[in-house]
Amino acid sequence: MKKKIIITGGLGYIGTELCKLYSGISWHHKIIVIDNRFLSERVNQIQNWNMEFIQGDILDKKLIERHCADADVVHHLAGVTNVPRTKSESSITHDEKIKKVGETGTQNILDVISNKCKIIFPSTHVVYEGINEVKNNIREDEKTKPVLSYSSSKALNEDQLKKSGKNYIILRLGSVYGYSTDSMRTDIMPNLFSKIASQNGTLKLFAGGRQIKSLVPLIDVARCFKFMEEKNEINSEIFNLTKDTVSVKEVSEICKKHNPKIILKETNDEIPNLGFSLSNKKLLNTGFEFLYNLDQNIKEMIEKWSSQNIKKDLEYVKDGEKLFKDERGTISNHELTEPINLIGLINSKKGTIRANHYHPQQEQKCLFTRGQIIEVFQDIINPNSPKVTQVVNEGQLSVIKPNV
């Protein structure tokens, strides 16, 4: 059955990986990605996967209603992720933003989706951050104890979903770790430690690294969202989505195993609590299986970051960009990894309209050296495919797929 699937926050850390998973079946379903940001390379990739991208905010209820009213599934990932981790980092303005986006945005979606729509929502393990003593294997029915604005907002979101009468799945995520080529987060402990380890740095272990952490691999999180979408028999449930329960010191020792050059330094700095862990028994009973582990993810992150070029401090150097401009002029670089079998020039007058012929097998790439054009694409094999419109500016590369 063809489904209409909405992914809010689809350009984020988890959303990017979820879109990759859906890329293999996007020709069979209508998939719409909504995000309040516009990141051109990611948007272009989403459109190449035959997904529709909408730049919009979940606080815009009319926009949400227009796209979600007839949805079969909503993966509701949108929200503020730059959040305070201690009371000293909090501010009234930022706390209000977290509350408004999290609560009003979620309610907007709940108000407009139908009763047949399944909404899958990421909560967080930090809804238990107020627990003072070390507690292991916390189950889903344990009463939450939020403290800061982020966890309080997530706990309220859980109540919104449970009281909505809609078909919901709540996944309480552990700290999500893992390398992403598109949307990397280095504010998560395993990712931060791996980044430092890749540069032969020093890992500081507050309170001797005794704090317990509940962790979960990024790609397994995306897999679990898709798993819950596909399982029609799983409805109105909460699951703890965690895999690894480890101490901070154990994570640092894995980093040192993969790079013996790093230094581990234990300190007596205070920490809010010694941590807690969540039980994933209920989730595993559904048949979901984890495919990734902490050791292999840390190894991958260290290796990928270690292989990055380090800038030489000889003179002003700027690398890693396709286009560079300053008062001296413009430099653009575009890597073409495939063989080129035809090369030519297009020169058009301002204000004219031209129809480009299609290539049944080959991909056409056009580098614009001057001016600006508006392109409209459609897949001619699939008459119901969406029309894609994009603006191409000077120095940008236009890619025309086969049969388009």
Predicted regions, residues:
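C-terminal substrate-binding subdomain of Rossmann-fold SDR/epimerase-dehydratase oxidoreductases
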Residues: 201, 206-322
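Conserved metal-binding segment of the jelly-roll/cupin
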Residues: 392-404
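A short, N-terminal "cap"/entry segment at the start of jelly-roll beta-barrel domains
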Residues: 310-342, 353-355
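Conserved Rossmann-fold NAD(P)-dependent oxidoreductase catalytic core, especially the SDR/UDP-sugar
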Residues: 76, 104-149
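N-terminal Rossmann NAD(P)H-binding glycine-rich loop of SDR-like oxidoreductase domains
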Residues: 5-25
